[in-house]
Amino acid sequence: MQLRNLSNVSNIDLRSENEFKKGSIPQSVNIPILNNDQFKKVGIEYKKNGSDAAIALGHSLVKGSLKENLIHHWTEHLKKNPECLLYCFRGGMRSEIAVKWLNDCGVKVNRLKGGYKNFRNWVISQHLDIENYIKDWIIIGGLTGSGKTDFLRSFKESIDLEQIANHRGSAFGVRDGGQPTQSDFENILTLDYLNHKYEKLILEDESRTIGRAGLPGFWYQKMQSSKLIILEVDDDKRAENIYYEYVYDELNNGVNKDILLEKYLGSLNNIKRRLGNVVYNNIKDLMNSAFHQNEKEIHKEWILTLLTSYYDKMYSCLLYTSDAADE
């Protein structure tokens, strides 16, 4: 199986839970042969007494019903995903032993050569040269609230970077569930790009980082040198768009009003220094009034003040840094 096709099936990641949390092959399921505590003990034994002693300890830690339970879970997953691979960090002893145990039970399975480390090195290599990005890239830009994301999603040729990063790409852009690790962000983005079937790629204009997720390698430079199309929307419509996305939809989806207010006040406080005390206090007062009165027009007032006092000034410095811009 080619590395670019690995996310087409749900592979079995045999590494410990903590290793898996740091990054994995997309769509993988974590069924560790050694859990966190066991992996730590085996690692200490390896440093003290070498490979043979570590392997022996591993076998003593995973035997009997524990071993049988593992084999059962692996087998059940393989029944649903017969083309899946097993992998550990380097494609070494953990995956070798797991394959042997399954083979001994009459279950045939392959492991990923070189393991997760090989996959990660391959992902990184895809971004080491800007010439690797061979598609015709088109960037959708515009001031905050101009509807770039909705416009982007109307095209089948698009990749939604903010969706992958689970962040709206702004000071108020934090989403529930947290962001993926940097490794997971790069893994998902790389596979999405390499499996993108169209000659043109449409992306939303983004900063070098989306929340905590950094665009890999030369990706940002490629965006900066690509054709830029700017969406123009009047201020009232922009405030309306932001209201529905950040307030109405959130409350309509069951988010508690007080929790949402506290979240946005925290985001506002993070940019207090850039706003200055007068503007900060004005937005804060309007925001409190809007949430307490549940008044759309007051919401739009604090949103518009935030747009014109912060976001527009920030974006205007970045908007025309690409090589070509069309309105």
Feature names for model-found ranges:
Residues N5-L78:
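Positively charged, proline/Ser/Thr-rich regional signature most characteristic
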Residues G58-K113:
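Catalytic cysteine-centered active loop of the rhodanese-like fold, especially the PTP/DSP P-loop
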Residues L66, E245, N253-M314, L318:
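An accessory alpha-helical subdomain
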Residues V109-S125:
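N-terminal pre-Walker A segment at the start of P-loop NTPase domains
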Residues I139-F155:
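Glycine-rich phosphate-binding P-loop
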Residues Q163-P216:
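Conserved nucleotide-sensing/catalytic segment adjacent to the nucleotide-binding pocket
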Residues Q224-I242:
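Conserved phosphate-donor/acceptor-positioning beta-strand/loop module used by diverse small-molecule
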Residues Y320-E327:
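Conserved small/polar residues in nucleotide/adenosyl-binding loops
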